[in-house]
Amino acid sequence: MLDVTLIVLCAGNSTRFEHKTKKQWIRIDNEPLWLNVTKRLASFSNFAKIIVASHEDELNYMRNFTDDFAFVKGGDTRQKSILNSLQFVTTKYVMISDVARACIPQSVIENLLEQKESADCIVPVLNVTDTVIYETNTINRDEVKLIQTPQLSLTSTLKKALDTTIEFTDESSAIKAINGTIKYIQGSNESKKLTLGNELDELPCLKEPSKNFFTGTGFDIHAFEDNKVMFLGGLKLPYDYGFKAHSDGDVLIHSIIDALLGACGAGDIGEFFPDTDLKYKGIDSKLLLEHIVRFIYNVGYEIVNIDTTIIAQKPKINPFKHEIKNSLAALLNIEKQFINVKATTAEKMGFIGRAEGVAVQSIATLKYYNWKQK
């Protein structure tokens, strides 16, 4: 086994990507890009450890995909993500790559590893073939290099180099700043960094997402409580009683949230918004749903449709169905024709039949966001 740890940085917000989904979560067949890239790099050599640095909101979800990697909370900059990851590195060397470089060839990895003892940092580069002008001066293009990742560094030197408040854009710049030794090796055009959405077609190693559909169910039930405002589907209903709950008690929204989370395999509402957390006390459930919808899109899905059944002896739901559908369509960012709201009673049986509360059953269908068609 190599005395080398591989770190893959996946904590970015994809602000320049111009797609609904973060670049690290676009699907390559059935795999998110971060998993596809990390497995690809892992297959090229026998690394001692593989660390994936991710956005805090996505860490637990990532763990659903594999137990083969360690997951670390990333920072709000590339350098902070590296620093967080380095706390868990005990090997002599560390190789750091960006998830946005999806098609790195095996030859680059092998060359980096072969040269690991020749300098403090080994860096793949490309030469410039076009004329280069800085302001009004023509620069000798033979002196210009395009720096790529992954880069392989001596762990102790990199830790020392990053012990600073100065932000660097790559490891070699930090190591060079403390007079560490740098060795440049030949990079590859295949290691192109994915930044803008229209660059996806320039990465031939990426397959289009599968056309699978994913279905989840959600169920919630709440008792009535007098002298509270009733919220249902994001609407305020004209009654002098509402739902007993830690939040505002919107039983319909809670059911839909669980259905959405079930469809993408992300757990349940309590894992995202625990009722032991005071910041969710009395919270508007529309905010919870908006958070989950953003999460759904961020991690690579689109909402296909929602079907929901409200089980209530009271209040009567039919007068509000149209408004509920409009409210949900706006919250879910889908057309209302893809939302169905049904209502039934419990035929005066049990808790619901005695008009003590309401239950809701929801079904959500998702599909992968198809970046090939955008």
Per-range role (PLM):
Residues 1-7, 11, 40, 170-172, ...:
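SAM-dependent methyltransferases
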Residues 2-57:
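N-terminal glycine-rich phosphate-binding loop and ensuing alpha1 helix
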Residues 33-91:
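Conserved N-terminal catalytic core of the sugar/cofactor nucleotidyltransferase
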Residues 44, 104-186:
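Conserved core of the sugar-phosphate nucleotidyltransferase
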Residues 94:
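Short aromatic/hydrophobic "clamp" motif used to bind/position activated sugar donors
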Residues 204-322:
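RNase III-family endoribonuclease catalytic core
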Residues 307-316, 321-352:
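Short, conserved loop-to-beta-strand elements that form functional interface hotspots
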Residues 353-373:
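C-terminal edge-of-domain segments
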